[in-house]
Amino acid sequence: MAAAPRTVLISGCSSGIGLELAVQLAHDPKKRYQVVATMRDLGKKETLEAAAGEALGQTLTVAQLDVCSDESVAQCLSCIQGEVDVLVNNAGMGLVGPLEGLSLAAMQNVFDTNFFGAVRLVKAVLPGMKRRRQGHIVVISSVMGLQGVIFNDVYAASKFALEGFFESLAIQLLQFNIFISLVEPGPVVTEFEGKLLAQVSMAEFPGTDPETLHYFRDLYLPASRKLFCSVGQNPQDVVQAIVNVISSTRPPLRRQTNIRYSPLTTLKTVDSSGSLYVRTTHRLLFRCPRLLNLGLQCLSCGCLPTRVRPR
């Protein structure tokens, strides 16, 4: 007798990774999943519904969910038949730029969505998972949760917070047969990333000194665009990594999705002092930009695999 489909609640499904993941799970050939695809603004649901096709209303339903609102979370969960078996914390927002030009309100918004939004959802589904002694919490983190990136101070901090919180929680939840998986993409070529880079390239960043603005506009932004061109993944590859994690009988705590990006994260892991990563990145960006360009060209030459192999 076939097992009942698992209910998967996904936040942030209006575009990008969340949308692609919801559609792929809903079209699972074995029909292992009943997907609740959520977004803050239901006015943006048309793209998701069109991509879902015949799965809409069958293995996929669309619901409103604002991860920054207790009331919205409670309302969403009350409309789900049964319990949430798999929670995918995908909703997120970015913030890039010189620190002096960023408001505290903007920084708090990032943490409210990226960190506290994820915590709010976990608190809501955890009692049911503990009672049933089973469940899987998947968190879409980032390689920026492993290493800081220049001019991404606040975004990286929100991802570092996720990594520490969920690694700590994983120890307790293993006793309840509940697994936590932190999925850590590198650069992903999505509408989210494209809009963010376009917006910051036009921003004024008041209160920032001219030298820092020069570094941001003339060094960081061109290097960031080249990084996306060289090692950026498409959402489908990242989604496949997430699907592999969800379908695993023994889900990993961490899963990086981009093999081409791994040399950059290795710089931090091989040196416990942290100096190797900071000094190498500083040297490449500020002193040897030609060497940085050469390295990015090497990563993009096509001799390294980019797709995630099923496990």
From Swiss-Prot:
Free-text tissue specificity from the UniProt record: Detected in photoreceptor outer segments in the retina (at protein level).
GO BP field: estrogen biosynthetic process; retinol metabolic process; steroid biosynthetic process; visual perception
Pfam families (UniProt xref): adh_short
GO molecular function: all-trans-retinol dehydrogenase (NAD+) activity; all-trans-retinol dehydrogenase (NADP+) activity; estradiol 17-beta-dehydrogenase [NAD(P)+] activity
Entry membrane topology: Multi-pass membrane protein
Catalytic site positions: 155 (proton acceptor)
Residues at which substrate binds: 142
Binding site for NADP(+): 9-18
EC number annotated for this UniProt entry: 1.1.1.300
Reactions mediated catalytically: all-trans-retinol + NADP(+) = all-trans-retinal + NADPH + H(+)
Keywords recorded for this protein, A-Z: Lipid metabolism, Membrane, NADP, Oxidoreductase, Sensory transduction, Transmembrane, Transmembrane helix, Vision
InterPro entries, sorted: 17beta_DH, NAD(P)-bd_dom_sf, Sc_DH/Rdtase_CS, SDR_fam
Entries under CDD domains matching the protein: type1_17beta-HSD-like_SDR_c
Gene3D superfamilies, per database record: NAD(P)-binding Rossmann-like Domain
Keyword Lipid metabolism: yes
Transmembrane feature ranges: 86-106, 137-157, 169-189
Subcellular location: Membrane
A GO CC term assigned to this protein in UniProt: cytosol
Function: Retinol dehydrogenase with a clear preference for NADP. Converts all-trans-retinal to all-trans-retinol. May play a role in the regeneration of visual pigment at high light intensity.
Family named by the database record: Belongs to the short-chain dehydrogenases/reductases (SDR) family.
Protein name: Retinol dehydrogenase 8
Gene: RDH8
